[in-house]
Regions:
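Amphipathic alpha-helical assembly/interaction segments
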Residues: 1-119
């Protein structure tokens, strides 16, 4: 599988894990639901923006969309950290997602740097 397709699959799997995490949050806790919806929105946007990047009409648009991916991934990490720190879910559920998020940020950062260097 090529790297582009692999990252498409990886970001989609990440989004699916975020969806399952949201579904596991307590339904009767308003704070958990607010934080969860924010994580859901940001976490599912990473893959959507990555797909948009590969439909970009220019190198500048590609770089911009990869930047959007990075922003959403960083925001996702923020919401996951709050969910962990407020004990809405156990660390063993959140830490693997946070690790995957960190890895996605690293890959996307590399893509962004290479694209800018080749611009």
């Amino acid at each position: 599988m090529n790297d582009e397709k692999d990252l498409r699959v990886r970001t989609k799997m990440f989004a699916r894990r975020i969806i399952r995490l949201y579904c596991a949050l307590p339904k009767n806790d308003a704070a958990a639901q607010v934080l969860g919806k924010q994580a859901l929105r940001a976490g599912t946007s990473v893959g959507a923006n990555y797909r948009e990047a590969h439909r970009a009409r220019s190198r500048a648009e590609f770089i911009s969309k990869i930047g959007d991916c990075l922003k959403e991934a960083d925001e996702t990490l923020y919401w996951l950290e709050l969910l962990l720190e407020e004990n809405f879910l156990p660390a063993q559920k959140l830490e693997p997602l946070m690790k995957e998020n960190d890895e996605l940020i690293a890959v996307l950062t590399t893509i962004s740097k290479r694209a800018k260097a080749n611009a």
